[in-house]
């Protein structure tokens, strides 16, 4: 999640971890946004340190993917470590079409930490949005099939915990 700077921000995905008073993960919320300004959250129950959630795709993220398929979502975020890794895999009929990985370290959100992060990573609030549009232009020029944006669904849906099931797409 990138903080709003000078009133500007775009976060394709933000992940929230809800913990109990003992520090154990209880709920994961994956908040997904598209470039049309729509947002949808996939929420699921955590069952330990290796939780894999599966959610039916009901939110239009990219005009280059159909409204079909499943997401496999996994987060590795130990309450006693600052390392965080998020893996998201989009599959249609069991075939992986897109895999996205986010890695980083947790930091306290202060003015100094934001400035230090901006300088160290050369990130800026609209960089993800610009990168998405550049990639979309490349796909469009390659004549990749284009899917129109449907009406946005309800604001959230529940993801199923599939940690104990076999994972044919290798997310686990």
Sequence positions of predicted segments:
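Mature, function-bearing regions of proteins
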Residues: 1-172
